[in-house]
A protein has these predicted regions:
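Short beta->alpha linker loops
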Residues: 27, 85-89, 151, 176
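General beta-strand structural signal in soluble alpha/beta enzymes
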Residues: 21-23, 48-50, 81-85, 107-109, ...
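Proline-centered loop/turn at the N-terminus of a beta-strand
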Residues: 17-19, 45-47, 80, 104, ...
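Conserved glycine-bearing catalytic or ligand-binding loops at nucleotide- and phosphate-handling centers
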Residues: 84-100
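Short, surface-exposed connector motifs at secondary-structure boundaries
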Residues: 15-21, 76-78, 139-144, 169
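Thiamine diphosphate
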Residues: 1-70, 89-92, 99-206
């Protein structure tokens, strides 16, 4: 396990003018934290891809189940992190991350089988570029907002359908990137998460 060296090599390649990327298990991003932090300080366009992002794949036990890693990476200044919910959001994540030339990015992926969200029924994945978007909405003002990232978005969609059948007005917000969501105007952020709707449920493995 040489994640620290892998991250350091990517930083060197980026300094030489190349566009490097590397991948590993999310749990072992702990070993890569110093080179990731350096790439942020140096504004290097390194792309770090981490898989096995939750307890959803548990064959290897708790040593391989990430809990606090998402919070640590999100707290690193200058790093853009995206956690897509399905194949459509993965494609949009690449479209968003590749043009970034002056900051490192982290793409966090699941390993277990996940459904591909039907975009004929739900909103297109292009909203990922703004960090968060309304995936499904209620008729009228929602009673509750269900927020999720990554593999948990599918769970929230199921909850939305059940609540809808029970007459509860719910909105589903896919929020693959917290820091990207800070960039759009406040008017957009308020349209996704209206301040007047305080009943909110966030679903994530950590």
């Amino acid at each position: 396990v040489r994640e620290h060296v892998m991250g350091s090599i990517c930083n060197g390649l980026a300094r030489a003018g190349l566009r490097p990327y590397c991948s590993g298990f999310l749990i072992f991003s702990d070993y890569m934290k110093p080179p990731i932090r350096l790439s942020a300080l140096m504004k290097l366009p390194v792309l770090d891809i981490f898989t096995h992002d939750s307890i959803g794949v548990g064959e290897d036990g708790p040593t391989h189940q990430p809990i606090e890693q998402l919070a640590q990476l999100r707290a690193t200044p200058g790093v853009t992190l995206i956690r897509p919910s399905d194949a459509n959001e993965v494609a949009e994540a690449w479209r968003t991350l590749v043009p970034m030339q002056h900051r490192p990015s982290v793409l966090v992926l699941s390993r277990q089988n996940l459904p591909t969200i039907c975009r004929k029924t739900y909103a297109p994945a292009s909203g990922l570029a703004k960090g968060a978007y309304v995936l499904a909405d209620a008729d009228g003002t929602p009673d509750v907002i269900l927020m999720a990232t990554g593999s948990e978005v599918g769970l929230v969609v199921k909850a939305y359908e059940q609540l809808k059948a029970e007459g509860v007005k719910a909105r589903v917000v896919s929020m693959p990137s917290w820091d990207l969501f800070e960039a759009p105007p406040k008017s957009y952020r308020d349209s996704v998460l209206p301040p007047g709707i305080t009943a909110r449920v966030a679903v994530e493995p950590a």
